[in-house]
Amino acid sequence: MKYFPTLLASLLLFAPFTGSAAADWLLRSGKGTELLKDQKISGSVNLYLTGGDRKLFRPDPVKFNAESFDVTVTANGCDLKGWLFVADKDGVWFQSEKEFLLKDGKKTVLSVPLQAPGRNWLPSGHTESWSGRIRSAIYEYGITLCPADPDDSDTPYTLTAEDPVFPQKKADGTPLEIIDWQLPAEMTQNVMVESRFNLNREYFNPFDPDEIEVDFEIDDSKAEKRPVPVAKRFHVSDILPRVTKTLLPWEERPMAELELQYEKTLEKPEFQRYPAFYGQDFLRRMHFTEEITEAVGLPYWAFRYLPKHPGEVRLRLRVHDKTTGDILYSPFRTVTVKASDARGPVHVSHKNSMYFQFANGDFYYPVSMNIHANTDRRSESIFKWGMLPDRGTADYEDYLNACGKAGISMAEIWMASWTYAIEWDSARKGYGGNGRYSLANAWRMDRVMQLAQKNGIYVNLVLDSHGKLSSSSDQEWGDHPLNARGTFAKANDAILDDAEKFWSDFKAWVSNSKRNRYIAARWGADPHVFAIEYWSEVDLVKNGSGLYRRGWLQFWHGQAYLDIMPKLQAVTLHTTHVCGVGDSTHHYREICIDPPEFTHVVSDAYRSPGIHMADQLRRHTRVLSYGGKPMVVTEFGGTSGGSSQQMLKGDVHSALWGALFSGQGGTPALWWHDFVHKRDLYHHYAAFARYMEGLDLLSEKPVFGYRKTTLAGPRYQGFAHQLKPVDLSEDIIRRAAPAPSAFFHPFTYGDAIAHSWMTLGDSTYCAWLYRHEQTRVLPESLDELPLVTGQVIDFPVELRHGDYAVSVYDTFTGDVTHTQLIRHDGSIRKVALPPFRLDTALKIRRIMSK
């Protein structure tokens, strides 16, 4: 068999169809591409039609519903062999399994069935099987021809081709069926399980729940009752009047309908119900530095389930075919869940609402990294690395493996257009515009989640970033699949002529809801999803501040939460993010802090060069802690435009220790993750993680303190700067009034030693002592720093009487460098510290008698 696969199909933008006129067949051969005329041909050729202007192409229901692909051809000059072929917009090519013989001078009908998945069509240059996905996405199609007799390879011939025909299938009344439901009989508590199955029907858009809605239901008498969200909890009574009074002319949807959509009561099925999803397996290989993923086999249906307690549970499938109205329930199947010590999903702690815990009650203090992209163009420029290769998930594999070894336990991952967005511009390979999701990217996201789980890392999943709705800040609106003025607007089925309308247009809301349903179905049961972050820097979208003043951002976030929350099994943490330090977050408090449904506060902590990172974090705590929620910085590292490498190294080091001793709910996530990776700075994280071993900030609410003293000596004047210890206990925080004036501005007085500490109940004291200026900008060589000697601390007299172990830590290795025993009887006692050059950390813990 000899055939020539079609190359660069996506670049051919012919428009052969006009009204009822005959199609213009294109002839592709070794001589190039030309219109088929009466010319004589020799050798092998491809005779084909395109789907028209590529910028206008959308999946075609006519081809999806076609029974077969039929073409009538007449050859003159010699006998020919022929095969039909089809390809999608990305050049995924299929050729008919059947070989046709075209007799010289005779009209021949070439016909190949289209409806049988996995049959009649052979993949060419890839491993995907024939299915409805390809059938609906046929962009170009035609015939491959070559002389039947090798001796005729130079014999000239002519051929005539009639317009192709796609006869439509007829409804046969076959009942809806579930096929090959694979469900394990045993499961493990707090370990996610995937269950696959198929249906005997294919769907034009299997991602659209208005066409096909597939769910699974749980009959579990021991299950925790999920609260039904009530819209009024999201301040709807305050927001709706504000929105109603400020409607603009283009906000055409009646407010009554928006209010109805917002305040709708959830359907209350008899059993717990969660969405299933449509998926596809892929093969992955590296071609030099490029990651190549190829679909393999047939698509499938699946659901993911997280059993939360041991015992017996019954599960069943629910399939609602909305094209016919059929609703099918499978019989219940009983599975046994074995008890395990798996920790389960992350929650806000019920013991101390400023911190996190696992479902089993274990304390979780995330040591964080922001891996928003595998390659960052700003890093390449700032650090003068040159353009780095995009290695896809191979880069994430390297990052996450290194993070796991260093004790980093949380990574921020973006579903960005350059990483793992499942919906984007049809111009891009693998994407289908509005409502048609990238199965390849979903598979890649699965791989990232598997790598995270293997390395003990939890993922802060960011659904959207500001550039998607901006034409000025990291602008991507031009390529947004909803942009009706974009180049591929028709191909995307775009609906918005202005990015600002995203927040109030009902069709845009429905589109976002369907996408979030898929996200919830695929990753909402994964206990390694730390949280859902709805937006990164949402204030930077077009007219973000105006949308906030008018209440639309508040309104939209309320809708989004109410929509996605009931579809999530494991994920309990929700938040959104704005650009800027704590005062910016405070300014947008109605979406960042105040909503009770939003569980924690995220913010940036970029800084001016003269501000120490630890001081910046204390500032954040003072202005944001009034909400009584965990605080996590998800972007930091010098200024937002980058800084010197030594300043960034100072931030990497100081942020870890500064976060712990300022009451943050986890360590900040560095934006410049590739800087840590290429400079191999993971030892900072590993040392901190070792220090954190055995610490539990839940059992006793920590009380924090800070002071700074100038080193005495001929070059310095003695000076002491004392701050009143800050009590961050829950009760005090909840009574505190929010006030930006709570910020204080640190001052550096020569070579100062800063001392941050916390007490945990009456039996534990922790401290970090550091040279203030030298940890703000890390010296090139620590060995050049003179030793700090003679440092002592007062033994905390508030601790219970008894025997205590003092452990002093090297903050660069996590090693214990000095230990001593102290008997505390209530008298004032000094604890002498060994010399250090940059900083040191210690723990004083009561020795419990056996």
Predicted regions span which residues?
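Extracellular ligand-binding interfaces
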Residues: 43-129, 137, 146-157, 165
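Short carbohydrate-recognition loop motifs
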Residues: 26-51
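Aromatic- and carboxylate-lined catalytic core of secreted/periplasmic carbohydrate-active enzymes
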Residues: 253, 628, 639-641, 652-820, ...
